[in-house]
Amino acid sequence: MAIDPHPPEGRLAEDRRLGAGRSDWSSWPTYEAAALGLPGSWWYPVMWSSQLGRKPVAEQLLGEQVVFVREAGRVFALNDRCPHRGVPLSLGTKEFPGTITCPYHGWTYDLDNGVLRAVITDGPDSPICGKVAVRTYPVAERLGLIWVFMGDGDGDPPPVDDAIPRELLEHDFAMGGNIETRHGGWRFGAENGYDEGHAKYLHRNSLWRLFRLMPTWTRTRVVPTDDGWITRVQTEVHWEADFPGLGTWSGRRWWKRGATSKMLGASPSKAAKADPAIASLDVPGNQSIRLPGLLRIVHSRFIHYEWYVPVDEDRYKYVQIMVEFKAGLAAQMFKLRYLLLFRWLFHGQFSAQDEWMVNVMDAPPERLYRPDVSITAWRRLCEQAPRNGQAVRKG
């Protein structure tokens, strides 16, 4: 079908009204190029510590194949490819202490430094030993998770504690969580998590919010806070809206708990019944995000965190944890509530609504609107990644 090179003015006006959207993310070049993760060096949570036993575990992270091995209680991570013929080392075995052996020809690598120590099929005097090595990655165990340091540069990485929210280092807490691989790419996952607009509509009928009223629309600003976070602060909260020529829309239902003036943009850390650990955060709003992709949602009694760890250009590891700052019997009661309730309602059905949208999202092109101030603030933060990465410390 031929295309009219001179469309009528009416059609041009219609095209301008609808908008063609952005052709790319060229306003955020670092972000646009970050399909496999932001530049710089970062600690990422990968799996539960309990998932790594005697057998090697293969993972793909930031487009790289990595094998995790536990030896004498310590975790190691190596590039999951034997340099000989490209066979995954994760298919191999531990024939000698402190090593992993390729299943094909018996090439055996040191877990600590990746150096080829022996070639079983070439005898003890194999001349290639010591001349070949696979890449190794720093690893650590914290919060019941295995963390890996993915980045470039020589020298020792910064402490893994630098990547963990300080409140989790300063207080006792009970925790529940979920890790799964999702489609859509880590950037869409992070944008969905920090997006101001979607929760009020997409999640209005979720079981997690079944008895709690959601606003219809809000006004929001984004402010930088401590430790590299940017925080959403609601300046206006509206529970219904009258749309001219259409009618009134409201999420009010007889069974939903009504809103009060104290709920209008209030900081959960300043709530009268806020947990002391949460009150000490003194955050201006309940939702924050920081590099390289860690979301924190603060409630008055608990905090939810989620990491978006790139797997490849289309997939990411979605790591969710929920914590209450409790000890003893109260901690055990939280764990029970998590297993019986929160795991299914929040980390399950509620989160599955987000997965649905992220999986079908197709942008750019895109046309942003006022609530997307949260998304553009996040993209601007990502542009600082080359300067703000968890840089390798020399010496």
Regions found by a protein language model. Name each.
Residues 3-7, 74, 80, 154-395:
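C-terminal catalytic domain of Rieske-type non-heme iron oxygenases
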Residues 20-23, 38, 102, 224, ...:
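Alpha-helical structural elements
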Residues 2-20, 25-31, 47-174:
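Rieske [2Fe-2S] iron-sulfur-binding domain
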Residues 32-40:
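Non-catalytic accessory segments flanking enzyme active sites
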